[in-house]
Amino acid sequence: MPSALAIFTCRPNSHPFQERHVYLDEPIKIGRSVARCRPAQNNATFDCKVLSRNHALVWFDHKTSKFYLQDTKSSNGTFINSQRLSRGSEESPPCEILSGDIIQFGVDVTENTRKVVTHGCIVSTIKLFLPDGMEARLRSDDVIHAPLPSPVDKVAANTPSMYSQELFQLSQYLQEALHREQMLEQKLATLQRLLAITQEASDTSWQALIDEDRLLSRLEVMGNQLQACSKNQTEDSLRKELVALQEDKHSYETTAKESLRRVLQEKIEVVRKLSEVERSLSNTEDECTHLREMNERTQEELRELANKYNGAVNEIKDLSDKLKAAEGKQEEIQQKGQAEKKELQAKIDDMEEKEQELQAKIEALQADNDFTNERLTALQVVRLEPLQEKTLKECSSLGGIQVDDFLPKINGSTEKEERLLSKSGGDCTFIHQFIECQKKKLMVQGHLTKVVEESKLSKEENQAKAKESDLSDTLSPSKEKSSDDTTDDAQMDEQDLNEPLAKVSLLKDDDLQGTQAETEAKQDTQHLRKELVEAQELARASKQKCFDLQAALLEEERKAYRNQVEESAKQIQVLQVVQLQRLHMDMENLQEEKDTEISSTRDKLLSAQDEILLLHQAAAKAVSERDTDFMSLQEELKKVRAELEGWRKAASEYEEEIRSLQSTFQLRCQQCEVQQREEATRLQGGELEKLKKEWDVLENECRSLKKENVLLSSELQRQEKELHNNSQKQSLELTSDLSILQMTRKELENQMGSLKEQHLRDEADLKTLLSKAENQAKDVQKEYEKTQTVLSELKLKFEMTEQEKQSITDELKQCKDNLKLLREKGNNKPWPWMPMVAALVAVTAMVLYVPGLARASP
């Protein structure tokens, strides 16, 4: 049993693979190559890392004669005409595929840094063949392709599906852009929070550093005071130390002022940058709200357009269904009309055949009637004449006694004949009976003219047999009756013949009566002949009337049938014409409605195209603005990172200074302790106790400051770590968003490039057509110029010929005048040069006229 076939053909944007011819005897697995299953031309295994091992299934359903494709929980998805069958890692329901569909297994994998496709996906065009070898049906008009009879219908059928797909893709892109904008807004909010936290941490760290500087300065002052108190110096040395201390104080104040000024400047710059960031954030929020409103409006318009498009498609489908129904009704009516026409034609043919058969029967009956009439007349002539002759011969041949003896028998026979003739009424059967009786009579009278009777009997028998054979079919009942009568008569004749010869005397007496009876019989026979002729004429007239009536009835039936047929044909034609007119009107109305709907859908599509272009431009502007905002945010992030690094460096420097100050402070404390131990003996108790108390207070403050410094440093490190982690996360998210935006930008650029290429192709085709038209126009112009030049030349030649003709006519007139003058002179006086002058005139005329003809001829 043959099986269905699926052919996978590689497309240019696909991972390269050989063309696959896969027979679908059973469900075929589509997936990545493994050790047990390698790629081959008769399987659906591909050497591609994007595919899963069990990516999809393809099979052919013999019940419905359809092909199906199912995604079996693939990670990267399966696409039919850029539409995904299911979500990630979910099994899709079986989806019908048609011949010519574009099937994609997986998606392209790209690098974020170089934006280069590292692993391509499988993109193929599938061709499907049924088990009988025929190609499966292609995708219908409402999805991708729509080949219709006219280019207008092609545009009306093809462009809506393409633009609906583009609108769907644009809506998807806009949704993705909105999602990215929301993510960017969230990231900006987190950045703002981080900036606020970093500002607070920096403020607290600066405040802690300032407090620490103050404490250190106080410690130094107190140390100096301790040194001054511990030393017993003179006033000059004390003055010098005071001056040095004042200078140190002044230097510390200047450094503190400069540091404060720098901190204030940095704070002002940070505030300014923060205000700029807030301003840009508000602008981006306004733009986001505007874009969101635009997106909502475009989505509403897209929904309205989709609804209108679906309504138009449904109306077109309804109209097409109505057209099909009307065409079906028209075909049914035509079929019914043809069937009725065929039935009527068959009835007409049957009636004509019956008419021919009836005519043949009528002719046959007419011929039989004529033949029977001729036979009857012939039989009457043949039978009656011999009977008369017999009677005469018998009368003449019989002598006195014999005649007298047989007269009563003859009279009895004549009476019987008259009786039989009166019974039969001139029927041919009675003639046959009469012949039989005559035979019996002649057998009794055998001594009378045997030879003549035998010859007559033989003739009569032959004629009777012929008549019986001719009239056996029509006169069978009369034969039966006549046969019964003849048998009865024969019996009666036998009884009469068996009577004794005693009746001879009676016969003699009745001779005269016999002669009278004979004459009466002759008269009766003549009367019967007349009646028979009249009956024959009446039969002929009745038959003729019957034939005429039958013919008239047939003619009337034929005419009525023809009239019925003509009326039915006219009614059918009228109904067909009316129905055709109605169908034409319906078709015209439907065509007009379809044209109006197509024009309205075209206008809507043109407006949708304009809106799509505007949306493209708005999306491009939004993408460019988003890119600029993203770049500015990246620059600001870089600046913030640089500032954070500067702050970190400053904090590290401050920490180093604090450590150095702590080390110096510890050294000084040790020195002070040594000096205090040395001078403990010198100092008195009250001052030493005061200094110890102050020292303890300062130590406690120093410890508390150290603890605060440790806490602030740990808090600063924690915040720096959080800031670093958040900045890394945000940078990763921003890079991923940037890659997605770049991918969408590339897709939009590819779409714009394809649209531009299509536009360029159309423009090139139009240019070629325009160039061809221009060339044709130039050729026509050249031909026109050539014809104009030829016409001008012909006009000039015509004018020249006209001038020459005019000049020749003038010269001829002059010559005629000269000839007249010469003739007049010749009449007055004979001139011998007259023929010479005529010849010269003719020669000059020929010389002047022939070149003009030669010029005018080309």
Swiss-Prot record:
Any GO BP: protein localization to plasma membrane
Keyword check for Ribosomal protein: no
PROSITE patterns: FHA_DOMAIN (PS50006)
Gene3D superfamilies registered for this protein in UniProt: 2.60.200.20
Stretches of the chain found on the membrane's Extracellular side: 854-858
Membrane topology label: Single-pass type IV membrane protein
Annotated stretches, region: Necessary for targeting to centrosomes: 1-165
SMART domains xref list: FHA (SM00240)
Superkingdom in the source lineage: Eukaryota
Region named Disordered: 456-492
Cell location: Cell membrane, Sarcolemma; Cytoplasm, Cytoskeleton, Microtubule organizing center, Centrosome; Endoplasmic reticulum membrane; Mitochondrion membrane
CDD domains: CC1_SLMAP, FHA_SLMAP
Record's keyword terms, sorted: Cell membrane, Coiled coil, Cytoplasm, Cytoskeleton, Endoplasmic reticulum, Membrane, Mitochondrion, Phosphoprotein, Transmembrane, Transmembrane helix
Residue span, FHA domain: 28-85
Family to which the UniProt record says this protein belongs: Belongs to the SLMAP family.
Official protein name in the record: Sarcolemmal membrane-associated protein
